[in-house]
């Protein structure tokens, strides 16, 4: 809980972070479907014998190629099956944290028996939509999630409606802290970070604890594309320098390797994404360690990073064709810049250079290769900080970057929200053709 004596705006900032920065086990799109299946199974009279599911095109895109923790398998069908047979309906984004070896075996058997189907919901106007219907004979239960990864809007069984709420608004519109955040500025966020009592934001240190553990796992195990471990080996071989820049990339990408490779450790997510949480956390942690920052300075830097990432992502669709590791890395750039010199000018220049650098990176679905994009974004963030420290940045005379950082952010988000919709459709079409 936060101090009720804080001014209302700061309270909303803290609430926004508490709502958007949460532990998540596994890639959050398959996990959203697993949660729907788990809640449906909890409502079903009798054991689950069959699972049917429907998801939005964007959720299908992000679920086709990612490993579900503990299963060694990729895709939405195993997520739906395991959610139904071994999920904890009360655990939110950690729905699979208690899944046993027996539950995993049962889920795989259900899949092998052809008792699990996942289809694209048609028509579907929602960007984030998942519906799971579980059966026991003629008895059934159905759960629908819309707008946010854990935002259950409808529960129904063969006996009738159990729960319903309005499902046509977005998660951002439902959450008053995010609505407040949409009306703020980076300068106001920086003032908050500089002046808020440490005790009120100490909780953000949990993001460092969780994501550092995931990073260590990525370096010690053969997860995903093992980018972090590979780059670390190249340092030992003398092909890559053992310096701060390398450490930022290695430790950040290692956490994503483990995350996307199916490690059974939670990530601290940001804006519904584990990779965004990793990207907003690990570069800041590495720089803080380099400068010997104490817990208070680390907490303030992490709060700036996570809150800036949320602030930018809040201007985007929940899922889009824009790789949001890039926007999370803009938050990381802010946090790292604050650690080095703390000036608003340095922070704003770093973010502007990020927008001029990696803003064209597409999201072609969740997969092991996300760690490549995470590593690229982390590297670009530190490069932008180094440029800003030398009073150098992409200027408002170039591309979509404006003279004002707030306008630069708005330009980027307008591009992702409108023009890149066709890009998203093309990506989904290409991925669907590969799956056939």
From Swiss-Prot:
A Pfam family cross-referenced in the UniProt record is SDH_alpha
The terms under GO molecular function for this entry are: L-cysteine desulfhydrase activity
GO biological process, alphabetically ordered: L-cysteine catabolic process to pyruvate
Q: Enumerate the InterPro entries for this protein.
A: Ser_deHydtase-like_asu (IPR005130), UPF0597 (IPR021144)
Q: Which family does it belong to?
A: Belongs to the UPF0597 family.
Entries under HAMAP family matching the protein: UPF0597 (MF_01845)
Q: What is this protein called?
A: UPF0597 protein YhaM
Q: Please name the source species.
A: Escherichia coli O127:H6 (strain E2348/69 / EPEC)
Its gene? yhaM
């Amino acid at each position: 809980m936060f101090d009720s004596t804080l001014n209302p705006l700061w309270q909303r900032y803290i609430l926004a972070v508490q709502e958007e920065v949460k532990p998540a086990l596994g890639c959050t799109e398959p996990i959203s479907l697993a949660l729907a299946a788990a809640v449906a199974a909890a409502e079903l009279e009798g054991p689950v014998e069959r699972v049917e599911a429907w998801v939005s095109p964007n959720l299908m895109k992000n679920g086709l190629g990612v490993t579900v923790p503990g299963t060694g398998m990729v895709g939405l069908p195993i997520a739906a099956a395991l959610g139904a047979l071994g999920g904890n309906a009360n655990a939110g984004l950690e729905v699979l944290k208690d899944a046993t070896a027996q539950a995993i075996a049962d889920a795989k058997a259900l899949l092998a028996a052809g008792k699990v189907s996942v289809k694209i919901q048609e028509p579907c106007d929602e960007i984030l939509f998942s519906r799971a219907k579980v059966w026991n004979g003629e008895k059934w239960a159905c759960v629908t999630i819309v707008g946010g990864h854990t935002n259950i809007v409808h529960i129904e069984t063969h006996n009738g409606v159990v729960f319903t709420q309005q499902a046509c608004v977005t998660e951002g519109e439902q959450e008053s802290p995010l609505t407040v955040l949409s009306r703020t500025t980076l300068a106001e966020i920086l003032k908050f970070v500089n002046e808020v009592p440490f005790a009120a934001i100490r909780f953000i240190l949990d993001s460092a604890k969780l994501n550092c553990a995931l990073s260590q796992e990525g370096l010690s195990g053969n997860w995903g594309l093992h980018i972090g471990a590979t780059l670390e080996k190249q340092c030992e071989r003398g092909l890559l320098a053992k310096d701060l820049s390398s450490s930022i990339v290695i430790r950040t990408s290692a956490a994503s390797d483990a995350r996307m490779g199916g490690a059974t450790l939670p990530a601290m997510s940001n804006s519904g994404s584990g990779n965004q949480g990793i990207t907003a956390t690990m570069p800041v942690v590495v720089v803080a360690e380099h400068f010997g920052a104490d817990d208070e300075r680390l907490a303030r830097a992490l709060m700036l990073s996570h809150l800036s990432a949320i602030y930018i992502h809040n201007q985007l669709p929940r899922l889009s064709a824009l790789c949001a590791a890039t926007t999370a890395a803009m938050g990381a750039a802010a946090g790292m810049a604050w650690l080095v010199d703390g000036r608003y000018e340095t922070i704003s220049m770093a973010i502007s250079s990020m927008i001029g650098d990696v803003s064209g990176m597409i999201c072609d679905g969740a997969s092991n290769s996300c760690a490549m994009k995470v590593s690229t974004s982390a590297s670009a963030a530190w490069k932008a900080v180094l440029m800003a420290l030398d009073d150098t940045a992409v200027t408002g005379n170039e591309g979509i970057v404006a003279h004002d950082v707030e306008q630069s952010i708005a330009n980027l988000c307008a591009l992702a929200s409108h023009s890149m919709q066709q890009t998203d459709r093309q990506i989904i079409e290409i991925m669907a053709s590969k799956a056939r």
